[in-house]
Regions:
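Active-site/ligand-binding neighborhood in enzyme catalytic cores
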Residues: 1-60, 65-67, 74-76, 84, ...
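Core domains of carbohydrate- and sulfate-ester-processing enzymes
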Residues: 2-13, 95-96, 231-242
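A short acidic, glycine-rich active-site loop
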Residues: 30-31, 109-114
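Short hydrophobic core segments
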Residues: 58, 82-95
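Conserved flavin/dinucleotide-binding core of flavoenzymes
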Residues: 67, 73, 78, 91, ...
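Flavin (primarily FAD) binding-site architecture
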Residues: 90-108
């Protein structure tokens, strides 16, 4: 066949595909935990579950020369309790931490407030049959589209040839995420189905159920991930990465791999080393 003309290549927005692999994280070989990404969190729960307090909303964080005290409320009973320790490694997103009553210095509080968080939304669509495999012989991968609000439809990379399947119906950010999140869950599903129907003829007829999330509207997230700019990396990041007193912060927001579990884990290792160093001094 004849090669496409340069004008046609530009019109196809092929550059958007290449731009997705320019960032360092996208250039590396990636693996998925068997059973889904939440298996990493479940593995932590399996190892340290006895130390986890569920339904516990942090109310205050106070420290002195000897230790740190965190006050929290049981969201089921309303009971307020507290726990104290020599050090605190706080993994609460900055978007949430800034609204908690702390005794951080003004400089530290300003650094916490300086970091913006990305509005992000996704929807999972369960299909009663895997039409993309049965009809189109597509196994895994992504469908990149210029349909506003959709961005990417991702097909499952596991469970091939099984009866049902869950695909990612949209993955959007910023203003588009804010607009779509204003819809009800049912309206979000309708929006995703209307768009997907333009690509796959069996999209709507195969639909069974949906689950959507807008992370900027989730109470304990208030955003998909931290969005650093050059200014804040130079001013706020050095303040936050050092922590204050006996409180250190950790999470994807305290790494250069924001939005990734890998960034959160690397951040934790780094901060644990600091606690060990300070406690051993």
């Amino acid at each position: 066949s004849d090669p496409l003309g340069f004008k046609d290549l530009l019109a196809s927005k092929l550059g958007n595909v290449y731009s997705a692999v320019q960032d360092f994280p996208m250039q590396n070989t990636m693996f998925q935990p068997v059973g889904g990404m939440d298996q990493i969190a479940k593995a932590f729960e399996k190892r340290v579950g006895k130390n986890i307090r569920y339904h516990s909303e942090v109310q205050t964080l106070r420290q002195n020369a000897d230790g740190v005290t965190v006050t929290f409320k049981d969201t089921l009973s309303g009971k307020v309790s507290s726990v104290s320790a020599d050090y605190c490694l706080c993994a609460i997103p900055l978007s949430v931490l800034r609204n908690i009553d702390t005794d951080f210095s003004d400089k530290f509080k300003q650094a916490v407030k300086a970091v913006a968080y990305a509005p992000v939304g996704k929807i999972g669509l369960q299909m009663k049959r895997r039409f993309w495999e049965e009809d189109d012989h597509i196994y895994g991968g992504h469908v990149l589209t210029d349909i506003k609000g959709i961005n990417t439809i991702s097909l499952p990379s596991t469970g091939w040839q099984k009866k049902k399947g869950v695909l990612l119906g949209y993955y959007h950010y910023q203003n588009t995420a804010i607009e779509i999140s204003a819809l009800s869950p049912a309206e979000r599903a309708e929006f995703a189905l209307d768009a997907g129907q333009k690509i796959f003829p069996a999209y709507r007829s195969s639909f069974e159920s949906a689950f959507s999330v807008a992370w900027h509207r989730v109470q304990y997230n208030l955003g998909g991930w931290a969005e650093w700019n050059d200014k804040n990396r130079a001013t706020a990041y050095p303040v936050l990465i050092e922590g204050e007193g006996r409180v250190l912060l950790a999470g994807e927001h305290l790494s250069y791999l924001t939005g990734w579990q890998a960034g959160a884990i690397e951040s934790a290792w780094q901060q644990i080393a600091k606690i060990h160093e300070r406690a051993s001094a």
